[in-house]
Amino acid sequence: QLQVEDDDKIGLYSYKVQSTITSRLANTMIQAKMVNNAKRSQHIVFDVQVPKGAFIDNFTMDVNGISFTSKIREKSEARKMYSQAKAKGKAAGIVRSNALDMENFKTEVNVPPGTRIQFELHYHEMIRRKLSSYEHVISVKPGRLAKHMEVDVRIIEPQGLRYVHVPNSFGDHFDGITTISKGEKKAHVSFKPTMAQQRKCPTCSSTAVDGNFVVQYDVNRETTGGELEIFNGYFIHFFAPENLDPLPKNILFVIDVSGSMWGLKMKQTIEAMKAILSELRAADQFSLIDFNHNVRCWRDNLVSATPAQVEDAKKYIQTIHPNGGTNINEALLRATFILNEAQNLGMLDPNSVSMIVLVSDGDPTVGELKLTTIQKNVKQSIKDEFSLFCLGIGFDVDYDFLQRIATDNRGMAQRIFGNQETSAQMKNFYNQVSTPLLKKIQFNYPQESVSDVTQSSFHNYFGGSEIVVAGKVDTENLQHLESIVTATAANAELVMETLRDVEELDGFMKKDRYADPDFTRKLWAYLTVNQMLAERNTAPTAALKRNITKSILQMSLDHHIVTPFTAMLIENAEKDEIMLADQPKDPRRGCCPGTLGLTPNAPNNNKGIPAWANVTAVPVSFMPEQRSPPVSSLSINR
């Protein structure tokens, strides 16, 4: 979004977005070129929305040929340099990410008449698979008509593309303007509306381009054990098996019915819950808990999801009337008690998956109020036996707490905006976790050949998602990399093997001028930093937290990315004008569920399985791979 004092006198002569996805790694550049045609100085705001979780890695600015470039520094060092520049009377400004969701990069510049200015922001992210699709979302909000407008997205996927789809997110106004060119492993998406096409109406001076440009796609999957991609000393293992029977699930819905849920939020929650209950499978077991200052159970134990029980649960949900306070601690402990009791009594299928889904819109006001104590109580009660998923409705809830408690218990959290879309958002989240296909997934690699492997042990795999593991690999002394994945399916203990030539991708990558030759390193760093951020969030001691912080800082500096512990200094060549870009201290960012780090290898006696593979159960089904070879403000007065 470009904001100025006098809209009519600022010309936007170019607004360009270029994004290249190489094996799920999206590098995005947003560039705006403007000129101040007014007879006085103008205040220009460059405000760009960046996807939550993306890493900003570069920002440059050019003002009448004067270039400003960026570098990453440790946060306190960067702030010190910024303060020194400001104290000496040098031009200085602050660029801050939005403290709420970390989604905005914003700089404000005061430019004299006739000035030409160019902003350019670069960031990268890993595109995660949800509901059987990768969705790349780019915020395109130029704020005004642009003489040249372009959104250009290229997709390079060595696995091959199943489909590419661009929903009409800007509305019918832009029907037929987006072009899609799709090959076997590459695709090109282009959106180039003329100035006339950008107008809201033929005589309007405002732009209709205001929203998210979305590209959806999926890749081909020929192997059960996943896809290994090896390049430039790193490997990435993409794992998304299909055509498996769902595991039965034992699910407890814990719903906040305190007074703050009154009105639209409760109405939408009831609507969502009725739809979710209808989707339970016959093999599932479930119950409902609603809580305010008191805790009530629809059933004191799990019941089978028969049509009669589901219908009765819907009627119960319909009778809820929000009032009173919020006793989160008691509600979660009651839920864990029901699941633990069912397990102790042998009522749960050994191959089933147990989970709690908490829906709340506020902090505790009754019972235990200390968040760290609630987190400790829930952790001790769950005992790593099942998963906790948290939905935080609106902005009064402490979303950071929900993320900590979910991550600590093999789950994840999501913010739900308390509006007319609440029901759809809740159903969308449930659909992501409604179909567990595997449990106890363990990735194994030869220890003498790999190092610095990211999280390799996962509690569950849900249909439509994808598990990604990365690490460093010694390609100098290795011709092939082998992986063995073990997991529990509905009817078998699986052992899945994958073997890849370490040079298999070399030719493909060198032939494509758009592919990022650094994609494996960036994906490994992205996963590693996010994993450490999650690990730090739940670190039990201050000493461990400090050590993790040091590691995150070093990774951030090594890979030139803005994280909670680094800042971006933006300055001109003479170093007499400086800006500081940083993030708030505590990021509200979720990460990787499950155990962090490599699980120590256990001895195994399975014939045909390498000694380094951590296979503790005798395989019922051995599935080898089947594959044919192949700124507050910055004032500039010049």
Residue positions per predicted region:
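Short, solvent-exposed loop/turn segments enriched in Ser/Thr/Gly
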Residues: 26-30, 353, 481, 549
